[in-house]
Regions:
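Short helix-to-coil transition segments within interhelical loops
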Residues: 22, 335-342, 420, 429-430
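Alpha-helical transmembrane segments of integral membrane proteins
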Residues: 31-42, 295-318, 352-363, 398, ...
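Hydrophobic, regular-secondary-structure patches
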Residues: 41-132, 148-152, 242, 270-272, ...
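N-terminal Sec/SRP start-transfer signal
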Residues: 1-44, 55, 349, 422, ...
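Mechanotransmission and gating elements of multispan inner-membrane complexes involved in transport
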Residues: 187-194, 198-298
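Hydrophobic secondary-structure segments that place a key small or acidic residue at a functional site
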Residues: 117-129, 137-231
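Short helix-loop junctions at transmembrane helix boundaries
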Residues: 361-401, 411-420, 424
């Protein structure tokens, strides 16, 4: 037998011994493996969560130069105007919106009116410019999977996720609820809507939004005052066209410019409006504020996850050291039948690698199962597209780091085992 063949046989024997040794200590083995798996899963979850939030928020709106709303924090304005998160504290008048729309620097505007919902999904009032100018991702246009945009007053266009979750089809009828979120509210039961279109999936908050016209938003509130129906006054749906349906207020507006060179001039003019307290925000600036906030949270979670992993590796060292006392005779017998100190070193390093490689794979499996369960909830509640499988370089490097940490951590106990004298395990203690 050649030297290479002999070495391979020897290594194969040691690998089999490592597996059998782990089987003989299965309780300690599995406890250590599960702790490594959980810490790996936690690290990967933080890493994937950071990327999922970044990707979802970044692709939600593109090609919009300014977001205009009532004066508040830039981040809050962007969150409720684009991502439907939170509630607006103030509105802007239609006259203020018209002043922005007529500005010589402005190419197009999209009015946005919020405040109603349907079974927990937000309702957005807008006009035809929304379907013509709104962009997401890599400046992609909204596409209708079925039907057409709203033409009649009580037409509604559904986002893909709304239609899928609630099972709506073209021609179905539904009623809206005053107020946002899952809290119970007063239904606009006297003015039902008909589904005229269903948008193709976008992976953005558009998917979980119902879209109606601004005229419709005004119509369902004709007999309302201070957030409640006026007692004794009922305006049937077939009579609303007799009224002026121009809105008095809207929530916000998305603005596109003829040339981006004028964005700061227009922003300054809007923020300095003398008739109304307005705020114009660059989406990129507001997103940077969000990234700074998330960066603090992410780094904290990463540090905690890394600490949990270090504790799991310390547990691995402790388990190997504790097993040395129980395995003195086993190791001595291996020496007696011809195992060299280097073989014992390799044996225990193999056990450490077995634990961390198994823990890394189990951790990734736990992450995948958790992602399958959490992805629909995250998309529905916060509009975050959570990838179920993601073979990105950062995750692969993290898995490799965990796998390599095992044999490195096991070197010290393995070295101690290899230095034990043959007589230590074969001489009975009195």
């Amino acid at each position: 037998m050649s030297a290479l063949s002999f070495t391979l046989v020897r290594l194969g024997t040691l690998v089999r011994l490592a597996f059998r040794s782990a089987g003989n200590r299965r309780v300690n083995f599995w406890l250590t493996l599960v702790s490594i798996a959980l810490s790996t899963c936690l690290l990967l979850t933080v890493q994937r969560g950071q990327q999922a939030i970044h990707d979802s928020f970044t692709r939600a709106v593109s090609g919009t130069d300014l977001i205009v709303g009532a004066r508040t924090s830039p981040l809050q304005l962007m969150l409720y105007a684009v991502f439907r998160l939170g509630d607006p504290t103030h509105e802007i008048s239609w006259e203020a919106y018209e002043r922005v729309r007529r500005n010589r620097l402005v190419a197009w505007t999209i009015p946005i009116a919020l405040g109603d919902s349907h079974r927990g999904f937000p309702v957005l009032g807008t006009d035809a410019a929304y379907f013509g100018h709104f962009r997401y991702g890599a400046r992609e246009r909204l596409q209708l999977a079925q039907g057409k945009p709203f033409e009649q007053i009580f037409d509604v266009v559904l986002g893909a996720e709304v239609a899928r979750r609630l099972g709506y089809r073209l021609g179905d009828r539904l009623t809206l609820t005053h107020g946002t979120g899952d809290a119970p509210g007063i239904e606009h039961a006297d003015k039902p809507f008909q589904v005229s279109g269903i948008l193709a999936p976008t992976g953005t908050p558009v998917d979980r939004t119902l879209h109606i016209s601004l005229d419709a938003m005004t119509a369902i509130h004709l007999n309302w005052q201070a957030g409640a129906p006026i007692p004794g006054i009922n305006i049937p749906a077939d009579k609303v066209k007799a009224f002026d349906l121009k809105p008095e207020f809207i929530t916000a507006a998305l603005v596109g410019l003829k040339s981006r060179a004028g964005v700061f001039n227009l922003q300054r003019d809007i923020n300095a409006d003398e008739d109304e307290a307005l705020l114009a925000v660059l989406p990129a600036v507001a997103l940077n504020q969000l990234w700074r906030l998330l960066d603090i949270v992410t780094r904290t979670l990463q540090a905690l996850s890394a600490l949990v992993l270090v504790l799991s590796l310390c547990n691995l060292v402790t388990a190997l050291l504790a097993s040395l006392e129980q395995r003195q005779r086993e190791l001595a017998i291996l020496r007696a039948v011809g195992a060299r100190p280097l073989d014992l070193l390799f044996l225990l390093v193999q056990e450490g690698m077995l634990l961390t490689v198994g823990g890394a794979l189990l951790g990734y499996l736990l992450l995948t199962v958790g992602s399958l369960l959490a992805a629909p909830l995250l998309l529905n509640q916060w509009g975050i597209v959570w990838p179920v499988t993601r073979f990105a370089a950062d995750e692969l490097w993290l898995l490799a780091l965990v796998a390599v940490a095992g044999p490195i951590t096991a070197l010290w106990p393995a070295w101690r085992a290899s230095q034990r004298a043959l007589a230590d395990g074969l001489t009975p203690r009195l």
